[in-house]
Amino acid sequence: MHNGSPIIRRKSTRIYVGKVPIGDGAPIAVQSMTNTKTTDVDATVAQIKALERVGVDIVRVSIPTMDAAEAFKLIKQQSTVPLVADIHFDYRIALKVAEYGVDCLRINPGNIGNESRIREVVACARDYNIPIRIGINGGSLEKDIQEKYGEPTPEALLESAMRHVDILDRLNFDQFKVSVKASDVFLAVNSYRLLAKQINNPLHLGITEAGGARSGSVKSAIGLGLLLSEGIGDTLRISLAADPVEEVKVGFDILKSLRIRARGINFIACPTCSRQEFDVIGTVNALEQRLEDLITPMDVSIIGCVVNGPGEALVSTIGVTGARNHSGFYEDGVRQKERFDNKAMIDQLEAKIRAKASILDANNRIVINQLDDNK
């Protein structure tokens, strides 16, 4: 029930990764990357499908060898989500996966080779109508740039990016996005800020090698949160040493927190104290697991007492305010006569949330149909 985001997004050009629009006001796409052996086709396809179930928009797949490229052909045939091929060192792999229907090529200027090789990749991308991501990384800058700056700096990452943007510009190829990732939050943020002032192409955001599930999520939330709040960013990936499914969940949580893109339940829950009248933590944990399948955006407040409960419930789709034995229930900010038994809270809340999601989905379908009729 909160209003939309106050963030004014940076203007950028539009490209498509598969059928997913990127830039020019399109919803910020959430990306992840498989961490299976690409030559293990079954395992890779299974992971891609798991990512699809939690809402991933785009999946990147590492293609380190020609054997992996052959495996990619089979993976692509079994996938419905757009796939990006991650290419390092051997530009010929990019040419091969283009034949097999890849939706985007990610090349690393630090190791892809000289300009003649880039020209071949661009020519191939043009022939197959495939966009490119110029993926700069603070850990793999070109040797001459490393020597010039001594260490990764925002200016170094910018120079690497602009060098290759200029190449694509000279080749009259504009179907590309750019990233300037680093594992240090300040280095990444300042690199993206510099780049955003130089080009109007879409930007892919990420704090690379951010760490494990907890620390990596925190770093990514800080770094990407800063950039997104400034309107910078068109796609993102949360790079975690964890199950890639967690990357997608964290990515959507960041977008949801900034009210940029809503998907699923936004839980508002108190940290609890001795005033709580029911098990808030257990209730929230159980509902997060039970309601993972819901994609309908809604705010659900679960507050253990009457200090902040009524106020949060007023701006929530569904709200619960703790009281002795039976807690107050709110819908669309209005207190209902019905009360929840504190001992049966989880089942009752789940039923109410699912019922509300069905109503909201039905209303959305009506609106969409009316818009289609008016076209």
Curated annotation (Swiss-Prot):
Membrane-spanning residues: none
InterPro entries (alphabetical): Dihydropteroate_synth-like_sf (IPR011005), Enolase-like_C_sf (IPR036849), IspG_bac (IPR016425), IspG_bac-typ (IPR004588), NO2/SO3_Rdtase_4Fe4S_sf (IPR045854)
SUPFAM superfamilies xrefs: Enolase C-terminal domain-like, Nitrite and sulphite reductase 4Fe-4S domain-like
Residues binding [4Fe-4S] cluster, per UniProt: 270, 273, 305, 312
One GO MF term: 4-hydroxy-3-methylbut-2-enyl-diphosphate synthase activity (flavodoxin)
Keyword Iron: yes
Domain of life: Bacteria
Record text on cofactor binding: Binds 1 [4Fe-4S] cluster.
GO biological process, one term: terpenoid biosynthetic process
Keywords attached to this entry: 4Fe-4S, Iron, Iron-sulfur, Isoprene biosynthesis, Metal-binding, Oxidoreductase
Pathway: Isoprenoid biosynthesis; isopentenyl diphosphate biosynthesis via DXP pathway; isopentenyl diphosphate from 1-deoxy-D-xylulose 5-phosphate: step 5/6
EC number of the protein: 1.17.7.3
Reactions the enzyme catalyzes: (2E)-4-hydroxy-3-methylbut-2-enyl diphosphate + oxidized [flavodoxin] + H2O + 2 H(+) = 2-C-methyl-D-erythritol 2,4-cyclic diphosphate + reduced [flavodoxin]
Cofactors: [4Fe-4S] cluster
Keyword Plastid belongs to the record: no
Enzyme class name: oxidoreductase
UniProt family annotation: Belongs to the IspG family.
Function: Converts 2C-methyl-D-erythritol 2,4-cyclodiphosphate (ME-2,4cPP) into 1-hydroxy-2-methyl-2-(E)-butenyl 4-diphosphate.
UniProt protein name: 4-hydroxy-3-methylbut-2-en-1-yl diphosphate synthase (flavodoxin)
Organism: Yersinia pestis
